[in-house]
């Protein structure tokens, strides 16, 4: 609904407006044309406004009664007065605070039905059918909901505040007369001057009167004398020394006189009984087997391996055993001392890890086999290189590739070139060379007489080292003999 302009309002109450909306043409919308003339016309019209007429209208409206002023601006007579508006606002606030949402909904339904009746009855009336009160009543549930949400937000904000602990949680050291309990007279069994127990305290040992070296000598002497009387201990003597409380107590009672303390220990029954608990060799072996099987579970060790001893004696023996040479031997055999419960973050199955460690240990202990070299492959390759070089003279082959292949076949059938030959005056002798070939099979053919004569020139060299190394040392000599050999072979014309 367009509001009427104040400058065009007539006193009679009719409202008319000379303003009209500017509707751009299609060309303006397509080409985004901005008509500056319209802007200039609007500025000119604004400049021609007479402010004196507006002031007169405002003065006239100030003198009008409220009913006429409402009718002037299009409102009916149903608008309540300011006093009534205040009362309605107070009622609305009370309704909102009470939180009666159901009643608010019913009132909204009734108001909407009343509005429908009013619209039907006042069809001829040009004034609108709704009033300020109706608008407030429609908006009222929203206001209540808004205030309720604000209340919830405030509660949430209170919950989100930083927690500040009270000072009561701080602990105080309760020392002093103010923290002492007041015991009634009839509950306490003892008086203030009366002792709780009858026996006096006895000093068992005082280390300030005797040097440590003298105490160690005294304990060694006491242990030696008792061992001579009762038998040697299964644990060998070492740098360790066992604290004998009974012997130290006897030394205190004798005013730290070592000779008198040793004499009393010899006739003391209690000390003799204590020394009777010497572990035998069988008990030590059973204890070590139990420690290997059950670990440090001394209850299982005592129940299954060392039944003649108590759990306390097993624990005491364990700490003595760890200081002895017997423990060093046991640790070397089983690596018990090195297993310090190592943590492995990436390992979940410790049994697989144990198997891997055992396999690696066995593989490291196994001797590695010596490297084997294939002499046959090297000798065959050297033989082929030698024959290829012997069949060429000045870079040109004598009889072509056919002669080379024939020579290789005859060489394989007739003689082993890598084996040294031994010279002999008797060609029919049954002596064999180092490779197991008979001389009579090799020297019968007249074609191989030159090679045998060539190799017989230096029998000492051939016997001392193999022909392979001789080829590398003197390639000139071998190449000469082999070339003569190839010439004799190819001269017969055999292919």
From Swiss-Prot:
Residues 171-269 form the ELM2 domain. GO terms for molecular function: DNA binding; histone deacetylase binding; transcription corepressor activity. Residues 120-130, 387-397, 420-440, 477-489 have a biased composition (Polar residues). SMART domains: ELM2, SANT. Residues 274-326 form the SANT domain. GO terms for cellular component: nucleoplasm; transcription repressor complex. It comes from the Eukaryota. Residues 1-25, 76-131, 356-397, 416-495 are annotated as: Disordered. Keywords: DNA-binding, Nucleus, Repressor, Transcription, Transcription regulation. GO terms for biological process: chromatin remodeling; negative regulation of transcription by RNA polymerase II; regulation of DNA-templated transcription. Transmembrane segments: none annotated. The keyword NAD does not apply. Its main location: nucleus. Residues 462-476 have a biased composition (Basic and acidic residues). It is found in: Nucleus. Residues 83-94 have a biased composition (Acidic residues). Transcriptional repressor regulating the expression of a number of genes. Probably functions through recruitment of histone deacetylases involved in chromatin silencing. This is Mesoderm induction early response protein 1. It comes from Xenopus laevis (African clawed frog). The lineage of its organism: Eukaryota, Metazoa, Chordata, Craniata, Vertebrata. The gene is mier1.
